[in-house]
UniProtKB/Swiss-Prot annotation:
GO terms for cellular component: membrane. Testis-specific. Expressed in melanoma, sarcoma, lung, breast, bladder, esophageal and ovarian cancers. Residues 1-68, 205-255 are cytoplasmic. This is FMR1 neighbor protein. It is a multi-pass membrane protein. The chain crosses the membrane at residues 69-89, 184-204.
Length: 255
């Protein structure tokens, strides 16, 4: 009986010693893995990284577009207001513009509401930036065309002036008026279109630049998650191997 008890105690000591060695090796391996990757030492970090939901393409697009799009819209509105006030000050000058040869700028429409032909590209450009009209508004004083009052309709149109047969003024042929609302709208539209054409390539380029770091960060996150999963699988296999080795030692000691 005493010999049997001694053998049982010896087997128990050997099994306990083998289990302690296995636990010590496992703890050493986990400590080395933790030092190589400090982020994995936080409790629940691996599970949080593995179970973290990946953002969809809509959320990613919103994150990338929100900040530069807001800055772009703010700059567009600021420049539009600047263009509006500049056009207002440009339009607040004289009521008509006289060319160097003494002719009045071609009006946008004659007394019959028909458009006059543009004689040259320069006149077309000036007519765009300085449009004129023959509509007489309140608090406007009509001036004779080239200081000539008694002109026939053909001569008046040849001088690119406005002819009125209704007798609303003391003379029938008068100089056209500056079309301030039309000029302001044209300047405003030109500024808006120019701003969009200038800022759109810059915005697209900045969006492309922002997408590259985001893709790199996403790839780095995927690599970290993959590495953590591999380390977890290695530790699991290592613990299983140590447990099998401990059982084998125990069985060998029993024999």
């Amino acid at each position: 009986m005493s010999s049997h008890r001694r053998k049982a105690k010896g087997r128990n000591r050997r099994s306990h010693r083998a289990m302690r060695v296995a636990h010590l090796e496992l703890a050493t391996y986990e400590l080395a893995a933790t030092e190589s990757n400090p982020e994995s030492s936080h409790p629940g970090y691996e599970a949080a990284m593995a179970d973290r939901p990946q953002p969809g393409w809509r959320e990613s697009l919103k994150m990338r577009v929100s900040k530069p799009f807001g800055m772009l819209m703010l700059s567009i509105w600021i420049l539009l207001f600047v263009c509006y006030y500049l056009s207002y000050y440009l339009c607040s000058g004289s009521s008509y513009f006289v060319l160097a040869n003494g002719h009045i700028l071609p009006n946008s429409e004659n007394a019959h509401g028909q458009s006059l032909e543009e004689d040259s590209a320069l006149e077309a450009l000036l007519n765009f930036f300085f449009p004129t009209t023959c509509n007489l508004r309140e608090n406007q004083v009509a001036k004779p065309c080239n200081e000539l009052q008694d002109l026939s309709e053909s001569e008046c149109l040849r001088h690119k002036c406005c002819f009125s047969s209704s007798g609303t003024t003391s003379f029938k042929c008068f100089a056209p008026f500056r079309d301030v609302p039309k000029q302001m709208m044209q300047m405003f539209g030109l500024g808006a279109i120019s701003l969009i054409l200038v800022c759109l390539p810059i915005y697209c380029r900045s969006l492309f630049w922002r997408s590259e770091p985001a893709d790199d960060l996403q790839r780095q996150d995927n690599r970290v998650v993959t590495g953590l999963k591999k380390q977890r699988r290695k530790r699991k296999r290592k613990s299983e191997m140590l447990q099998k080795a401990a059982r084998g030692r125990e069985e060998h000691g029993d024999e």
